[in-house]
Design a protein with these regions (language model features):
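Conserved N-terminal entry element of GNAT/NAT acetyltransferase domains
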Residues: 1-19, 23, 27, 31-32
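Conserved GNAT-fold acetyl-CoA-binding loop/helix
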Residues: 29-51
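A short helix-loop-beta-strand connector motif used in the catalytic cores of GNAT acetyltransferases and
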Residues: 50-64, 80-85, 106
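Conserved beta-hairpin
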Residues: 60-75
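Conserved acyl-donor/pantetheine-binding loop and adjacent beta-alpha core of acyl/acetyltransferases
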Residues: 76-109
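Conserved GNAT acetyl-CoA-binding A-motif
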Residues: 105-107, 133-145
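Conserved acetyl-CoA-binding loop-helix of GNAT-fold acetyltransferases
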Residues: 109-112, 118-131, 153-157
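Conserved catalytic-core motifs of GNAT/GCN5-like acyltransferases
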Residues: 143, 156-175
Length: 179
């Protein structure tokens, strides 16, 4: 548990926190945003069920940021064993397999409540994740829709580097890594 500017960063540890993650996710899906918001603010793509979110959390806890006892940001930890349980992520895990990467944890999704953006929360979520999952894992791997310029820039700014990219339907995905 780390506290920075009255925001607490920690592992997700309750059903209530999981529910709050899902509620923040719903607010940031493309269907909930205008075109301008999507290009300026970014968006999340995958919708998780409570059950899968809970299973993922048990295998490797999600990282959350809390302010006033509310989840205001999250980074989902996804153990590679879940690679085939979320259909839309299967292609990413197939691509990672080709690279023969070992001992990595996938970051399944990151999201920050709109009023807490541009305050260093993104960087601190990943910092907390590294503290918790290293040395068990030696890198964090994720994918970003190449159209999601805001997310790509934010990941590059904290040290993510390109591994590979692939097309899935009409979307080009960049697979990136943080060591």
């Amino acid at each position: 548990v780390e506290q920075v500017d009255s925001i607490i960063y920690k592992s997700c540890s309750s059903d209530s926190e999981l529910q709050q993650i899902l509620s923040l996710q719903q607010k940031n899906l493309p269907s909930a945003l205008t075109e301008e918001e999507k290009s300026k603010e970014g968006f999340v793509t995958v919708v998780h069920t409570f059950e899968i979110l809970k299973k993922m959390n048990k295998a490797c806890p999600h990282i959350i940021a809390m302010a006033n006892d509310k989840v205001i940001a999250y980074a989902l930890s996804m153990h590679p064993k879940f690679g085939n349980q979320i259909e839309v992520l299967v292609p990413m895990f197939n691509e990672i397999e080709k690279l023969e990467l070992t001992d990595f944890i996938a970051m399944g999704q990151i999201c920050i409540d709109k009023q807490f953006r541009r305050k260093g929360v993104f960087r601190q979520l990943y910092q907390t994740m590294k503290t918790i999952v290293f040395p068990e894992f030696s890198s964090i791997v994720t994918e970003v829709d190449a159209e999601n310029k805001r997310s790509l820039a934010a990941h590059q700014a904290i040290g993510f580097t390109d591994l590979t990219g692939y097309w899935s339907g009409s979307t080009f995905w960049k697979i990136i890594q943080l060591k």
